[in-house]
């Protein structure tokens, strides 16, 4: 459960991310594909090379979903219901991959915002991304 302070940290950090969300998520996806090659199996039709338009496009989708989630911190299940259905029933993504992408996104955010990425902010963002992952995998059961 996100505390009020966690929510404040997440909203403040995401407001600083702003228009860079798509780029940061695309960078995190590249980092995930490089660091955890098995994650590539879900994207056999993608050009996964550095700077790929397809990876950037997916980064945009994920970035928009995270922005939507930040705007609905008190009701993530409703805000992400359609994405949860998509990932559970159509795409059948292994739930561990959400954790891997979350980790890579935290690394990416910390590299772009080192001053703002305090241990407290790190913990808040980690909780937020964990909550998003939990919601996205909730319909697997």
From Swiss-Prot:
Q: Does the keyword Isomerase apply?
A: no
| Official protein name in the record | Hemoglobin subunit alpha
Which species is the source of this protein? Elephas maximus (Indian elephant)
Q: Which residues carry this modification: N6-acetyllysine?
A: 16
Q: Which Pfam families match?
A: Globin
**GO MF, one annotated term:** haptoglobin binding
Indicate where the modification N6-succinyllysine is found in the sequence: 7, 11, 16, 40
**Keywords assigned by UniProt, alphabetized:** Acetylation, Heme, Iron, Metal-binding, Oxygen transport, Phosphoprotein, Transport
The domain of life is Eukaryota
Q: Which residues form a coiled coil?
A: none
**Positions contributing to heme b binding:** 87
């Amino acid at each position: 459960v996100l505390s009020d302070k966690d929510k404040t940290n997440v909203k403040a950090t995401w407001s600083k991310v702003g228009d860079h969300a798509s780029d940061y998520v695309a960078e995190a996806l590249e980092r995930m594909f490089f660091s955890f090659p098995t994650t590539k199996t879900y994207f056999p039709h993608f050009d996964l090379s550095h700077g790929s338009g397809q990876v950037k496009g997916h980064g945009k989708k994920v970035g928009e979903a995270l922005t939507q989630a930040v705007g609905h911190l008190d009701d993530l299940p409703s805000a992400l219901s359609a994405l949860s259905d998509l990932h559970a029933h159509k795409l059948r993504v292994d739930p561990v991959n959400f954790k891997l992408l979350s980790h890579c996104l935290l690394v990416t955010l910390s590299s772009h915002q080192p001053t703002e990425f305090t241990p407290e902010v790190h913990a808040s963002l980690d909780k937020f991304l964990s909550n998003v992952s939990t919601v996205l995998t909730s319909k697997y059961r």
